[in-house]
């Protein structure tokens, strides 16, 4: 009988497939696509998965750009999550030190999702290698999850049961630190409010008009007063997406506004949402207009899993990282100058640790404060405080134990959703971070496959955290994914 392979040998598959994986990442960067419009990116990833021996299934949950690649059979079943959508208006030349759009107004990968999807494929390839060469029972599934940016694709997929058979899941995100992501996130709802009025000549017969634009402005004013009377941690954002027209001498008959409501728990978001709805109805009543709302999407808060986070931290610390060249360090320094210089905000990191550990962590981080690339591992954080953002990974974390890391793919201090981040998306720094993330995720999965008791411990922790009620999808039945910025 042939001998099996070790975890370290399985992880070599990430290095072996570096060429195809990096090429796929660059192809996705070259043709950026926004939420639920990622048809080229889907084709690139499905092609890669099929070449690597995965069974590809498309149109998951009825979403054209949601798909999976499966290898193996039986239990345990592990999910590896990948994203690939871009952000509107962030077109940028690769590895440029100046803000220079490739195509004015076109999208760009300002959150590194070209790397995120392919890095997760790399992890799936290594896990497949481990299962195959060891003749082990088990299933690894790569999930292509569209529309994370403003679309909450995973939330729709979770609502429709796509992740129900998973025993656990892992994912990652590009960033400027090597760190296990610890803590919760903000749940959110996104809604469009539309107002319908009556047009008239604004000077000759204004009394005949019913201004939909006035309704939007009154709604926004009402919400402004509401902010004082909601919990401190909540946030209400808005964008007027249609003012009705460009003619001030016309009473505007139509106007719409997009709202994003955030809070630490789904129940808190829902309560604020109902109050915002009342304000919208009141604005319509005051202006003699009609109001209709369209529920666009929602996502749940993240559920921490310390069992998995500790395993992921172990792999983060043990797996070797590629050193950076002098050329890479110089490029990171130069691009850092475009946003005020590279640095680690040590105080921002320290708030995530218990008081008894702060001094030791500060002593560890201090020598790295001015590093141009953060070539170190952040110690495992203690806090379970809520992060100041939202992610649809939250919905997966309610369904099965889930853990994620951030890996260095950019110069220290690079702002997210910036031209500088887009510029670095095809760099060798980015490729090295993507490969490292793939190994850390695969190593975490293999550790859990080798010790099934860890899977049970992680599941037990999840049950304790979510309670008897379990996962209640925040997106109502019948709501379908919506592309906010469709292709023109």
Tell where the protein language model's regions lie, with residue ranges.
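Acidic/His- and Gly-rich active-site-bordering loop/insert found
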Residues: 4-109, 114, 118-139
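Conserved short loop/turn motifs at secondary-structure junctions
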Residues: 33-34, 143-147, 296-301
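General structural feature for long, well-ordered alpha-helical segments within catalytic domains
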Residues: 6, 17-24, 37-48, 76, ...
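Metal-dependent amide/peptide-bond hydrolase catalytic core
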Residues: 217-488
